[in-house]
Swiss-Prot record:
Cellular compartment(s): Membrane
Topology of this chain in the membrane: Multi-pass membrane protein
Catalytic activity: a long chain fatty alcohol + a fatty acyl-CoA = a wax ester + CoA
Top-level class of the enzyme under EC nomenclature: transferase
Record InterPro entries: Wax_synthase, Wax_synthase_dom, Wax_synthase_Magnoliopsida
GO biological process, one term: lipid metabolic process
Keywords attached to this entry: Acyltransferase, Lipid biosynthesis, Lipid metabolism, Membrane, Transferase, Transmembrane, Transmembrane helix
Keyword Transmembrane helix: yes
Gene Ontology molecular functions: long-chain-alcohol O-fatty-acyltransferase activity
EC number: 2.3.1.75
Protein name per Swiss-Prot or TrEMBL: Probable long-chain-alcohol O-fatty-acyltransferase 9
Species: Arabidopsis thaliana (Mouse-ear cress)
Gene Ontology cellular-component terms listed: membrane
Amino acid sequence: MEEELKNFIIVWISAIISVSYCYYISANIKTGVLRLFSVLPICGLFFVLPLFFSSVHFSSSTAFYLSEMASLKLILFAFDQGPLFPVAPNLIQFVCFTCFPIKLQRNPKSQPSQNHFHKRAFAIKIMIFGVVLHVYNYSHFLPQTVLLSLCFLHLYVELEILLGPLKVLLSMALGCDLEPQFNKPYLATSLQDFWGRRWNLMVSSVLRSGIYNPVRCACQRPMNSGWARFMGYLVTFLVSGLFHELVYFYITRETPTWEVTLFFVLNGVCTGTEVAVKRTAFLQRWWPVRSSVSRLLTMGFVVVTGGLLFFPLFIRSGMMERRANETLFFLDFVKRKFSIF
């Protein structure tokens, strides 16, 4: 644990120095190709940094924060696009907006409830997370379907527990309102609603600016608007799948199986098809669907496709059990350190 913490400090000091270079040097270079060339070495470094860890949590979070999010943000920043534009007024804000999955909320007064920290809901998630961690002790006795559902619940609850307080702390430290990372994904009424408006919203926002919008604009000339929109969804989900394959590689150091990429491509195809079908006059006029039914269908599709393509790799590699064991080990490590005092 001590060695991993040392690597963690070294990696994140390197990241802060790199982002500082972008703030003081790259920001003063003319927008476009020249600024892009100035940030590309930093993006390359961010893809190397997760390799310094053997911990599942450190490697996956560094890959998510730096390799995926920060790299895309800096590429968009090179063209005065994305969440880093306009440039933050000081270095601390620029570093935080680059290195963490946060985004400034432009109209905080219109959405006051999203900035409120729900203590009761958070306490319930902590309790659920504690139960999930200990259920892994009996994973060998659980049916495959139960184990897959456990992985899905573990992933969602852990992300909420980690990212929710992070958003609150950074909002207080920076003195500004930040957008939420999740918006009750279990209430999604469509795939478009789930992926675009409820699940991991910071990733959705960056991918929309960096992948979806450019692809859709590029395809509008040779194709009609419907096919351009479909290609935007397909390429965006493909890129997301490739990023997830990369995260798996950082954690397991094994050759990708491409199951996760297939999961995202399938969801991209179905989301694009869903959007196209919903825009038809026949469906709008003659096929209204109750919200309860649409929620059941949406979550059923995500859970079933995730159980077939996304989570089997978690189980085969023992990744979720490693995450659970690391969490319990870290809590024990902190307890022992504090007991000294």
